[in-house]
């Protein structure tokens, strides 16, 4: 729990120091690493998404999760969602998180 909190705070500090990171990188990272399952529009309506019953990132169910919860899912995986620890940098995880938050 403490490790997740420290990781989340570190990610938020990096994001605060680099405001242009999200604008330039987030959609590209999402498209490259997430869209195959979650869809380019993040609704989960891909063939894989429908089969695995992937949640729509625009939904209140997803948006009510804390940044720490979403960061943990992205890095460690959950259920059928694979872990991206070691596959995404902390900055890329932050970009994906900010992209998800932009879908409100």
Residue ranges and their predicted role:
Residues 1-4, 9:
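Positively charged n-region of N-terminal signal peptides that target proteins for export
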Residues 43-72:
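Gly/Gly-Pro-rich "capping" loops immediately C-terminal to redox-active cysteine motifs
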Residues 73-74, 86-104:
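C-terminal capping alpha-helices of c-type cytochrome domains
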Residues 27-53, 78-80, 102-104:
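Periplasmic/extracellular electron-transfer cofactor-ligation site
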């Amino acid at each position: 729990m403490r490790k997740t909190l420290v990781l989340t705070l570190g990610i938020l500090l990096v994001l605060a120091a680099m405001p242009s990171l999200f604008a330039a990188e987030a959609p590209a990272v999402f498209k490259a690493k997430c869209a195959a399952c979650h869809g380019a529009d993040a609704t989960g309506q891909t063939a894989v998404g429908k089969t695995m019953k992937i949640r729509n990132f625009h939904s209140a169910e997803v948006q009510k999760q804390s940044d720490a919860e979403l960061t943990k899912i992205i890095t460690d995986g959950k259920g059928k969602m694979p872990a991206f620890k070691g596959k995404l940098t902390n900055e890329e995880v932050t970009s994906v998180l900010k992209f998800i938050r932009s879908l409100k």
